[in-house]
Every structure is written in C-alpha cells, then in structure tokens.
C-alpha cells in the first residue's frame, strides 16, 4: 500500500486567494488531501490504516461522505467498524468523471469531516490544487482511494509509505 499526504499547502499565490490572505497567514489550516493507493486483494491493510482515522473523525458533529463508484456500504460493516451510522452518507454509482468535482463541492461546504472518493487515475496538478483549496476552505479531509492492479506493482515503487508534508520538509 502506498499513501501520499499533501497537507497545509499555502494558497497565497492562487488567483482566488486574494480574499483569503488573512486566513492564509493568520492561521494554519487543518484541511488536507490524502491519496491512498491500495491493493484490492488486501482490504485488511487499507482498513487497518484508515479505520482509526475515520473512527476519530466520527466523533465530530459533521458527516462523513463516501463517494463510491460501484459498491454500496453495508450497514453491518459500518457499525462493526465502529463508525457512526447516523453520520455516514454515501453516494454510490457516481461516475468517475464526476468524483473530483463532487469532492470539491462537498469539501467546500464544511459539512463533512471527511470526503472519500475512489479514482482509477492519478490526479492532475490542477485537480489536486482545487481539492487542497476546497479542503482548507471547509476545514475537512479528502481521501482519494486509488486501487492498483497487483500485477503492476513490480514496475514501480508503490509498496512503501510515502507522506508528503511541509512539516518535515
């Protein structure tokens, strides 16, 4: 499993940041975007990584939004995973071409502690920038879930944990 976390990137150079200058310099945003590249044949690893975070976020008064392409969340799984059933919303059958825009709209609202979306392709720089901006604006976490084919793992370095953060660089 490979994760990339992009946190607290400054938006002070963006064209739309003019009105947010005070926020950019006056406080540290807690909004962030994280990408989890995982093997579908190893769901336990993904659950071990994400469930503690989702359980902690479930203690907030805000919702958790799951934008899933195919599968529907099982009520039994949500409850057995320790997630608050009353705070979990799901939109299933969402077309992959609409996932990023849907995540951006949801993150901006501030109604969700976390927005989880599945993508089959890597984000473009523009998509990533817009997601980070939206997460910071809504003080939320966006999780990009990207399944990888186990056969393609031999071609690149995707088996390690990689965390990008300005706290360490």
UniProtKB/Swiss-Prot annotation:
The positions annotated as site (Essential for degradation by Lon protease) read 169
Which residue ranges are recorded for the region named Disordered?
A: 1-22
The UniProt PTM text for this protein says: Is rapidly cleaved and degraded by the Lon protease once DNA damage is repaired.
So which domain of life are we looking at? Bacteria
Q: Does the keyword Hydrolase apply?
A: no
- Pfam families for the chain: SulA
Q: Which InterPro entries does the record associate with it?
A: Cell_div_suppressor_SulA, P-loop_NTPase, SulA_CellDiv_inhibitor, SulA_enterobact
| Induction, as annotated | By DNA damage, as part of the SOS response.
Q: Does DNA damage show up as a keyword for this record?
A: yes
Residue span of region Lon protease binding: 162-169
Region described as FtsZ binding: spans on this chain: 106-112
**Gene3D superfamilies xrefs:** P-loop containing nucleotide triphosphate hydrolases
Q: Which GO terms describe its biological process?
A: division septum assembly; DNA repair; negative regulation of cell division; SOS response
Q: Which UniProt keywords apply?
A: Cell cycle, Cell division, DNA damage, Septation, SOS response
Free-text function comment from the UniProt entry? Component of the SOS system and an inhibitor of cell division. Accumulation of SulA causes rapid cessation of cell division and the appearance of long, non-septate filaments. In the presence of GTP, binds a polymerization-competent form of FtsZ in a 1:1 ratio, thus inhibiting FtsZ polymerization and therefore preventing it from participating in the assembly of the Z ring. This mechanism prevents the premature segregation of damaged DNA to daughter cells during cell division.
By sequence similarity, the record places it as follows: Belongs to the SulA family.
Per UniProt, subunit arrangement is: Interacts with FtsZ.
| Protein name (Swiss-Prot/TrEMBL) | Cell division inhibitor SulA
Specify the species. Enterobacter sp. (strain 638)
